[in-house]
């Protein structure tokens, strides 16, 4: 779940230029540490803005290849007031074999990226993106980046299907926005074989890894590669 108002805090600040220093206020995005538990045991902590905990957790487990589908999950327990999510797998033995380092840098990949572990990705032969559509989608993404427009402190990504934005997520970390969209798609049972991710963030190798393993064939970024 998302709570726009609770994600933004207004703080007193000092604004300085070459002539003066004045007291004013600024809207800033909150930062919380999400505790992700697997079968009741701590798995990792993810720095985030405090929204869509269930999607973020499921998307992260997918990108780490801890799960392949929603069918592997028995129960999702979210305690928003404690910034905690507990994912209970049907295979209880699996959690004892897993170690993921803490993610202080907002959802970055928990392991070093090994291209040998990338899942097969088949791009439809007739898959294409028209330049004008790409530009229009990016313009829409920027217009709908409400948290960024208020605070200038978030990244924003969106899932596009059939030329339309079907889901949009903002967070302090660009990695988190991808995991949220991945979690959303998994929970909604979306076919991502012809989907597109558009994002305001730089496309690092970790972003490519996450998008690739979701089965999404294309990324469009507003930033440098």
Question: What role is predicted for each listed range?
Answer:
Residues 144-190, 196:
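Histidine/lysine/aspartate-rich catalytic loop segments that bind and position anionic ligands
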Residues 174-225:
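Feature captures the catalytic cores and cofactor-binding loops of soluble hydro-lyases/lyases
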Residues 1-161, 167:
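Intrinsically disordered, low-complexity regions enriched in acidic/Ser/Thr/Pro/Gln residues
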